[in-house]
């Protein structure tokens, strides 16, 4: 009887470990298309240095029928005591329906006037 209970416990632990949700796909290379399933999140990670006033923004309109913006976070990758140290801008999106679209981000200088971005990067997103 103890062996059966132990076996049931081990199988339950194994199944619980397998049932977890897969982590969001993390992408840094715009040359590689992002392929995700419907309802899944993915992140685009870009080098950034907001301490200098530069910042990333979504350019144009997202195709809300295919992907939606979820959130934007920043993580420092430099010594916290270093003024002007950079880090990573982490953009999270969620796929909504099957389709293909593009997400374009622009890196803008510090300014109150509308200006062209210093850099742009475009990611192709394929939702299956």
Where are these regions (language model features)?
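Positively charged n-region of N-terminal signal peptides that target proteins for export
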Residues: 1-4
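C-terminal motif of bacterial Sec signal peptides marking the signal peptidase cleavage site
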Residues: 15-17
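N-terminal edge beta-strand
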Residues: 21-44, 49
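Short, solvent-exposed loop/linker segments at beta-strand-coil boundaries, enriched for Pro/Gly
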Residues: 52, 60-78
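Aromatic sugar-binding surface patches on proteins
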Residues: 83-90
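Glycine-centered tight-turn and secondary-structure capping sites
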Residues: 93-103
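Beta-sandwich strand segments
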Residues: 111-119
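Interdomain boundary/hinge segments at the C-termini of tandem beta-sandwich modules
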Residues: 125-127
């Amino acid at each position: 009887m103890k062996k059966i209970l132990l076996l049931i416990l081990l199988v339950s632990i194994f199944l619980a470990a397998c049932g977890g949700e897969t982590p969001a796909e993390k992408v840094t290379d715009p040359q590689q298309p992002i392929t995700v399933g419907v309802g899944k999140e993915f992140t685009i990670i870009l080098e950034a240095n907001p301490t200098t006033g530069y910042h990333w923004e979504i350019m144009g309109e997202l195709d809300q029928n295919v992907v939606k913006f979820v959130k934007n976070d920043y993580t420092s990758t430099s010594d916290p005591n270093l003024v002007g140290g950079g880090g990573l801008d982490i953009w999270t999106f969620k796929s909504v329906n099957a389709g293909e679209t593009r997400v374009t981000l622009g890196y803008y200088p510090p300014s109150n006037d509308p200006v062209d971005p210093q850099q742009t990067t475009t990611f192709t997103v394929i939702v299956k």
